[in-house]
């Protein structure tokens, strides 16, 4: 993301291809918007929530910080982040509404749900602000997004495995998240190769590790979802007999 960098200092070779990065960003925005809408739909359909609670709170906090407190100077980026934050409000609403259905087996968690959401959002908001104060807004926006995605992908796998059910999950949710996330590699590549003074850190080993970990978790997610769906279909056929 370049909306918090000093674009006036961008080299000519980056300005020539900045449009490619912006189009990739808009495509990423569309993918994640579809993901949010699909989660909202399946939350009402299955009376559950689609995104694990703590990753959801971290993700919403990040969108709030970089939409409201530190808005991007890039109009495309600002539009994408604002859209995500608005859609995520509805994702958050469905999580608050239906979370008690998933915690019947854990009375303490169920009783604390009204506190877990606001406390977690406040804590993650403070964390994102602290990161921005430590490394600068531009780097914090990117590193914070990496943290959100690591929590989200690992949380999605854990949630699917612990439920043992496809409630709140679908191939649409997975595919829109997968494509919406990894198309981001296009604008990361454009920025790293054409503006290395500002985005040379993209080639660091940690970023490579992050990408491989999240990719592996996304593949694990769709594999588990396929197995669970197959088991559910078999059970339905047996009941029909």
Swiss-Prot record:
It is found in: Membrane. Pathway: Secondary metabolite biosynthesis; terpenoid biosynthesis. One of its GO terms (biological process) is terpenoid biosynthetic process. InterPro entries: PaxB-like. One of its GO terms (cellular component) is membrane. This is Terpene cyclase pyr4. Pyripyropene A and its derivatives have very unique characteristics of selectively inhibiting the acyl-coenzyme A:cholesterol acyltransferase 2 (ACAT2) isozyme. Therefore, pyripyropenes are expected to be developed as a new type of anti-atherosclerotic agent. Furthermore, pyripyropenes have been shown to exhibit anti-angiogenic activity against human umbilical vein endothelial cells. Finally, pyripyropene A also exhibits insecticidal properties. It comes from Aspergillus fumigatus (strain ATCC MYA-4609 / CBS 101355 / FGSC A1100 / Af293). Pfam families: Pyr4-TMTC. The keyword Transmembrane helix applies. The chain crosses the membrane at residues 20-40, 49-69, 79-99, 113-133, 141-161, 168-188, 206-226. It is a multi-pass membrane protein. GO terms for molecular function: lyase activity.
């Amino acid at each position: 993301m370049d909306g918090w960098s000093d674009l006036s200092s961008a080299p000519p070779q980056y300005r020539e291809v900045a449009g490619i990065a912006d189009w990739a960003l808009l495509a990423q925005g569309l993918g994640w918007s579809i993901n949010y809408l699909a989660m909202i739909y399946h939350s009402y359909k299955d009376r559950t929530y689609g995104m694990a609670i703590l990753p959801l709170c971290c993700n919403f906090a990040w969108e709030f910080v970089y939409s409201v407190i530190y808005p991007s100077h890039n109009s495309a980026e600002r539009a994408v982040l604002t859209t995500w934050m608005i859609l995520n409000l509805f994702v958050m609403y469905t999580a608050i509404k239906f979370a008690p259905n998933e915690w019947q087996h854990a009375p303490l968690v169920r009783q604390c749900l009204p506190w877990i959401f606001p406390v977690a959002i406040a804590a993650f908001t403070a964390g994102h602000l602290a990161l921005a104060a430590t490394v600068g807004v531009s780097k914090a926006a990117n590193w914070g997004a990496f943290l959100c995605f690591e929590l989200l992908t690992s949380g999605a796998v854990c949630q699917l495995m612990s439920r043992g059910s496809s409630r709140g999950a679908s191939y649409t949710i997975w595919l829109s998240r997968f494509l919406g996330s990894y198309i981001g590699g296009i604008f990361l590549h454009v920025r790293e190769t054409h503006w290395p003074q500002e985005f040379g850190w993209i080639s660091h080993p940690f970023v490579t590790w992050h990408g491989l970990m999240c990719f592996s978790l996304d593949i694990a997610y769709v594999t588990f979802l396929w197995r669970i769906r197959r088991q559910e279909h078999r059970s339905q056929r047996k009941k029909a007999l």
